[in-house]
Amino acid sequence: MTEEYLSCEVQLAAMKLVKDVMLVKPGENVVITADTATDMRVVEAVMKAAYSIRANPILIKYPITGKAFEEPVYPVANAVSSADVWIEFAYYCVMHSPCFQKAIGNGARYTCLCGMDVIMLVNTIGRVKYDVLVSFGEYLTEKVQNADEIIVCDNNGTNLKAFNRGRRVKHSGQPAIKKGYPVMLGGQVSWCPVEETIEGTIVFDAALFPPDEIGLLREPVRLELKEGCVLEIKGGTQAEIFKRWLASFGDSNMYRLAHYSLGFNPGVLSATGRIVEDERIFGCIEFGIGSQGASLMGAFWNAASHTDGVVSKPTILLDGEVLEENGIYKEKTCVEYCKKLGVAGY
């Protein structure tokens, strides 16, 4: 892959990210954090896009830490705390860390795009009908928010039941219209049912990260949950790695289910090993374990870290109504949105 590969498409997608998603304005300080695993073609394109609209792009690049969701070194933490806009491309993101919370508290508009390369930028932003994607997200937000009983199952053995009891749903994939608010790559809505009502089994079958040793799953990882906490982890080698990683923190909050997330970015049709992309596989559901951010509007707690796992082809029932079946949306309005987005098979 040459430096010129998709160069025009990359620059167009970078401008779309800066101008239409992060809503960068002239004079704003745009801090871009990257590590040595970051695709610098993406970083350069985003810096050029920000500068072309007369913002002040500032790049901070550092060696990979090998640890996600943990506090970076002081110069990085200090810089992001005064950003108007913070775009994180570092493979090992620092979301949920103290500096993240400080930056959000100071009004930064933040997005986490860890692991994004030129193909991911073009496929998930540049070639997507972003206005339609945002509208679909708003519809799903309302649909889930109006439901109480949530049942998630699949052919691998996932069978999870919970109740929303009026909990709010966060559309994390919308433009950055609010100060002090994190937005994520388009194609995701997130929430947490009342934690104590979450009971059953989750079987991750596509991706799980961190720990770094996993990423793409070669075998299912089975979790048994009671009252919103992971009690047992079963499977093969990757399940054992995951079990040891969770235990290594010595933190009981690392076993708490933090969120449900529906994935629906039409540029992602299968797992790649980049979790920001994988948790948006079209039709998937992703579950977070560990820290739960305040913006999720759940119970809110801190933990030593956070991890995300993907169930690729769920069947989801909202108060008995089938939202999707085996990863394919069945609800009438959802099907119409899938057609507008140009998703194959609808």
Task: Tell what function each PLM region has.
Residues 216, 232-289, 295-296:
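Dual-mode signal for accessory low-complexity, basic/Gly-rich regions
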Residues 16, 21-23, 256-259, 309-310:
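Residue-level preference for alpha-helix termini and adjacent loops
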Residues 147, 199, 220, 257, ...:
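Short, surface-exposed beta-edge/turn micro-motifs
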Residues 218-220, 311-312:
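Short loop/turn microsegments at loop-to-beta-strand junctions
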Residues 1-218, 226, 251, 317-346:
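Active-site bordering "gate/hinge" segments
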